[in-house]
């Protein structure tokens, strides 16, 4: 379930994120056992690698403010992820690198937090699968056995939502909002090898192939993403 713009990941009636709804790419044939899927060594992954080309404005959408004088989309998403206390936050960058993110004073201050680590995806333009691979490689190197993945342009996922999914008992745990699946999604290490090797999809194909691995967790807030200026205005007007 993922899809990105500056992919780092609600209270607004707009379209659901495409994060795990893609249909391209391949899934490997090995099937993990769902046993041992619970984890107390989990990292948050915020996908923030895309160009945000649908947001037609003078600034990248992650630097757009939710209100005239309020925080930016990225700042809000990051703060919610940090406040969840799930674990370290891996921010996968791409079109915007570390220097671009640090140009925003508030973001620069957040990036000084030792809980946040930037992981660059040099092949960000090839699709989301590469960003997920960067994330799982980083998690493996750090000794984590699960990641909870969301998008940087989803500022309405609450800290409580991040925690609820992190505490999920499935090899794959997915948030639901009024019965509809959305981000974030927790992926235990046992399924990392089954993620698409290429393309712009996340975990949707795997969830469809192995529904027995999936646990749904009802969450408050919203997984709505802000892809366009119209999305932002719609949220502001509601």
Question: Which role does the model predict for each range below?
Answer:
Residues 62, 115-117, 213-215:
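Conserved beta-strand segments of alpha/beta enzyme cores
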Residues 4-6, 10:
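Acidic, Ala/Val/Gly-enriched low-complexity intrinsically disordered segments
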Residues 43-45, 69, 73-87, 102, ...:
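Structured catalytic core of nucleotide-sugar glycosyltransferases
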Residues 11, 17-40, 198-238:
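Conserved alpha/beta core of the MobA/IspD/sugar-nucleotide pyrophosphorylase nucleotidyltransferase superfamily
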Residues 87-91, 95-117:
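Acidic donor-binding segment of Leloir-type glycosyltransferases
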Residues 34, 39-98:
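N-terminal glycine-rich phosphate-binding loop and ensuing alpha1 helix
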Residues 47-49, 92, 150-151, 175-178, ...:
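Short beta-strand segments
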């Amino acid at each position: 379930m993922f899809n990105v713009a500056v992919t780092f990941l609600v209270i607004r009636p707009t379209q659901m994120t495409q994060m795990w709804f893609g249909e391209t790419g391949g899934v490997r044939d090995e099937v993990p056992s769902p046993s041992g899927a619970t984890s107390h060594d989990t990292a948050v992954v915020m996908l923030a690698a895309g160009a945000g080309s649908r947001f037609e404005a003078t600034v990248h959408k992650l630097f757009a403010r939710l209100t005239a004088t309020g925080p930016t989309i990225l700042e809000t998403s990051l703060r919610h992820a940090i406040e969840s206390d799930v674990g370290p936050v891996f921010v996968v960058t791409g079109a915007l690198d570390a220097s671009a993110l640090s140009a925003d004073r508030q973001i620069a201050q957040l990036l000084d937090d030792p809980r946040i680590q930037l992981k660059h995806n040099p092949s960000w333009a090839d699709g989301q699968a590469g960003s997920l691979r960067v994330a799982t490689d980083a998690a493996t190197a750090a000794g984590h056995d699960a990641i909870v993945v969301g998008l940087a342009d989803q500022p309405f996922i609450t800290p409580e939502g991040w925690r609820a999914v992190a505490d999920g008992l499935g090899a794959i745990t997915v948030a639901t909002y009024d019965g509809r699946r959305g981000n974030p999604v927790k992926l235990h290490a046992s399924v990392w090898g089954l993620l698409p090797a290429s393309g712009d999809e996340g975990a949707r194909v795997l969830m469809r192939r192995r529904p027995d691995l999936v646990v749904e967790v009802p969450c408050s807030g919203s997984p709505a993403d802000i892809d366009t200026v119209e999305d932002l205005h719609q949220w502001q007007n509601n």
